[in-house]
């Protein structure tokens, strides 16, 4: 089944109604459909948009080579399309994808938007995902001064004990109806839960997918 076949009739992208520029092109911003990280920007024309809809993977138009290009066709880092939105003027596309290999940029970075004034930084995206990346780094490169590294060293016993303690503190904060305390304790609980995920080699995106399923 193609991507377009999975859409209800009222949600099919009106390819001919998109406002293309004088070159017949429309900008397509691509983002991770789970955490919202902006991955790249490229150009589509009518034909590449239709190919994207038909195949369920992103196809773009190369202005320099004057030809279609299938994202990841050579590297294997394809993009599985999950949604396509167009703006209020119908002259820009927002494409939500599952990025295979978690690499969208030809430099090997996850996102093409990884530089600010020449300095490489983490791409803008979901805060939980960024915190999880830091936690995984502490797991893979432990240091004596890192609290997170000490949790990993203690294994399940230490990690699960902390989750139990933080869960109880969330309950108490809610019982006291203390909004600031609730926010702080839930943050602590989320953090230690992320440590448990990393300890058991469960990617946070697996949790995002479960949450997507539960909201339907």
UniProtKB/Swiss-Prot annotation:
Phosphoribosyl-ATP pyrophosphohydrolase: annotated span: 128-216
Pathway(s) the chain acts in: Amino-acid biosynthesis; L-histidine biosynthesis; L-histidine from 5-phospho-alpha-D-ribose 1-diphosphate: step 2/9; Amino-acid biosynthesis; L-histidine biosynthesis; L-histidine from 5-phospho-alpha-D-ribose 1-diphosphate: step 3/9
Uppermost EC category: hydrolase
E.C. number(s) listed in UniProt: 3.5.4.19, 3.6.1.31
Cited SUPFAM superfamilies: all-alpha NTP pyrophosphatases, HisI-like
Keyword list, A-Z: Amino-acid biosynthesis, ATP-binding, Cytoplasm, Histidine biosynthesis, Hydrolase, Multifunctional enzyme, Nucleotide-binding
Subcellular location, record wording: Cytoplasm
Catalytic reactions on record: 1-(5-phospho-beta-D-ribosyl)-ATP + H2O = 1-(5-phospho-beta-D-ribosyl)-5'-AMP + diphosphate + H(+); 1-(5-phospho-beta-D-ribosyl)-5'-AMP + H2O = 1-(5-phospho-beta-D-ribosyl)-5-[(5-phospho-beta-D-ribosylamino)methylideneamino]imidazole-4-carboxamide
GO biological process: L-histidine biosynthetic process
Gene Ontology CC terms, in alphabetical order: cytoplasm
GO molecular function, one term: phosphoribosyl-AMP cyclohydrolase activity
Coiled-coil intervals, chain numbering: none
InterPro entries, per database record: His_synth_HisIE (IPR023019), HisE (IPR008179), PRA-CH (IPR026660), PRib-ATP_PPHydrolase-like (IPR021130), PRib_AMP_CycHydrolase_dom (IPR002496), PRib_AMP_CycHydrolase_sf (IPR038019)
Pfam families per UniProt: PRA-CH (PF01502), PRA-PH (PF01503)
Ranges for region Phosphoribosyl-AMP cyclohydrolase: 1-127
Chief location bin: cytoplasm
NCBIfam families assigned: histidine_hisI, PRK00051.1, PRK00400.1-3, PRK02759.1
Protein family (similarity comment): In the N-terminal section; belongs to the PRA-CH family.
PANTHER family: HISTIDINE BIOSYNTHESIS BIFUNCTIONAL PROTEIN, HISTIDINE BIOSYNTHESIS BIFUNCTIONAL PROTEIN HIS7
HAMAP family: HisE (MF_01020), HisI (MF_01021), HisIE (MF_01019)
Name used for this protein in its record: Histidine biosynthesis bifunctional protein HisIE
Organism: Nostoc sp. (strain PCC 7120 / SAG 25.82 / UTEX 2576)
């Amino acid at each position: 089944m193609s991507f377009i076949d999975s859409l209800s009739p009222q949600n099919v992208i009106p390819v001919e109604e998109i406002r293309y520029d004088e070159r017949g092109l429309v900008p397509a911003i691509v983002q991770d459909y789970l955490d919202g990280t902006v991955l790249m920007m490229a150009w589509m024309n009518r034909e590449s948009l239709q190919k994207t809809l038909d195949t369920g993977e992103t196809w773009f138009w190369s202005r320099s080579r004057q030809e279609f290009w299938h994202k990841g066709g050579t590297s294997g880092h394809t993009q599985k399309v999950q949604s396509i939105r167009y703006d209020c003027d119908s002259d820009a596309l927002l494409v939500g994808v599952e990025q295979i290999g978690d690499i969208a940029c030809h430099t090997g970075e996850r996102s093409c938007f990884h530089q600010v004034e020449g300095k490489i930084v983490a791409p803008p995206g979901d805060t939980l995902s960024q915190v999880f990346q830091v936690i995984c780094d502490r797991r893979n490169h432990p240091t004596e001064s890192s609290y997170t590294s000490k949790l990993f060293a203690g294994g399940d016993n230490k990690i699960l004990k902390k989750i139990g303690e933080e869960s109880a503190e969330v309950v108490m904060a809610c019982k006291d109806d203390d909004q600031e305390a609730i926010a702080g304790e839930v943050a602590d609980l989320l953090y230690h839960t992320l440590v448990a995920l990393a300890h058991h080699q469960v990617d946070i995106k697996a949790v995002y997918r479960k949450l997507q399923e539960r909201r339907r």
